[in-house]
Amino acid sequence: MVTVRVWDVPTRLFHWALVLCLLGLVLTGQTGGDAMVWHFRLGYAVLTLLGFRLLWGVVGGHWSRWSRLPLSPASAWAYWRGRAPLHHTVGHNPLGAWSVLALLALTALQAGTGLFSDDEIANAGPLSPLLTGAWVSALTAWHKNLGKALLIALVALHVLAIAWYRWRQGEDLLTPMLRGDKVLPAEVPASRDGAWHWLRAAVCLAASAAAVRWLIGLG
């Protein structure tokens, strides 16, 4: 058994930056008023992070790539029966992979609907002028009510799952996302995590930020 780099620095920074942004969005959304300026800024930051993760899933570290997610029904069934191969549990296990995709998709939907929302008082998303009043009202209702509730519930479920794995399975999922490493058999491939790797991440982040800037300027 050896120490293997599973989660590279860019992946870990993305993860914790997203956590902080989501916490900030909940707080600023509940506070309202002048805090909504930061609510919008954090929303743009979330869109930038999601765009980065989309790109990083293609060019990032070995275990951060979309191709490494065990998403087939057969993988989930084998994991449920305790017969999953090692490479299906090094990064995200099959159930965790689907949970992560659902969380990212719902976060993207919530951030996207925020671009079109309008509280009809003082705050309007930059793309709200592009839609009719009926569509804006519908998307605003989703964003402020069901969408927010679903996202908070899914985040809570994610946290509970991490605690359950620690308590019942004895598997620490939190420390590897902090330090990046797991103790694994020597044959398990490691994720690259050096200066050139970080430069590639910076390019992906810059490209995502430029895309978000262009998007919010469409309104």
Where are these predicted regions, by residue range?
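Membrane-embedded alpha-helical bundles that constitute the cytochrome b-like, heme-associated redox core
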Residues: M1-G219
